Amino acid sequence: MEFFEEIAKFRAARRIYAKILKEKFHARNSKSWHLRFHVQTSGESLTAQQVDNNVVRVALEAMAGVLGGCQSLHTNSRDEALSIPTEDSVKIALRTQQIIANETGVTKTVDPMGGSYYIEYLTAKIEQEVEKYLKRIGRMGGALAAIEKGFFQEEIRRNAYQLKKEIDDGKRTIVGVNKFQDAHDIEPQLNSMDMKIETRQIAVLKEFKRNRDKIKVDSSISQLQAAAQNENENLMPYILQAVKNHVTLGEISDTFEEIFGRYEPRVSF
């Protein structure tokens, strides 16, 4: 992660969002110009080697998100490169957020990095590059067309390859991986899963379905199906009503799949 670039990225996103709402959609309520976004620290940056180093990585990434203006934040756990995290690892991730929120003072000021020459330079540069991307996507016919053409997937794939190549070639330092390795790296204690969890959860789900009002469930699904076939209909009220009537996420997803089909990603090499 490039720390300052990460902060600038969020600031640029806020600028672009406000600009689009004002200039393209002519939104008049200034509150609608505010970009509200959630940040999750990077799973890609977590290493299987020297897992305690990941605590530092997560803390820096979380701080970048906060300085960039996020409204909510998830901090990954140090051992997620290896398995589902242990309770201790999750607690450290939580404490990381709490220390940032309560001990650093960064939450007392709106846009604390604003005015920094370097941050403002990066923010403007990222904004310009993003606008180029948006125009490029627009020429393709929009985001959906770009997905169908495999544009986003290819961009991610190319970037991932370039990053891996830089690490393998030693051009990008990853502490504990291609530099500052430890021949006696301590094997972390990993989470062990109780395989009976699946059986117990299936039983809970069956009991849940037995005790709900089947008439309301069927009615909610039928209304959702009808709404989904009308491209001008807002589906959110129907989804909320279905949830209130105890329709499961799986059933809602199955309803949409029946109408829209299942997305098959374009494979390219």
Predicted regions and their residues:
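Short secondary-structure boundary/capping segments
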Residues: 10-14, 52-55, 88-92, 259
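Gly/Pro-rich turn-and-neighbor structural signature
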Residues: 1-53, 135
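Structured alpha-helical segments in the cores of large, soluble enzyme domains
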Residues: 13-14, 18-28, 56-69, 92-104
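Active-site-adjacent bridging/hinge elements
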Residues: 34-36, 69-72
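A general structural signal for short secondary-structure junctions and capping/turn motifs
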Residues: 27-29, 64-66, 136, 165-168
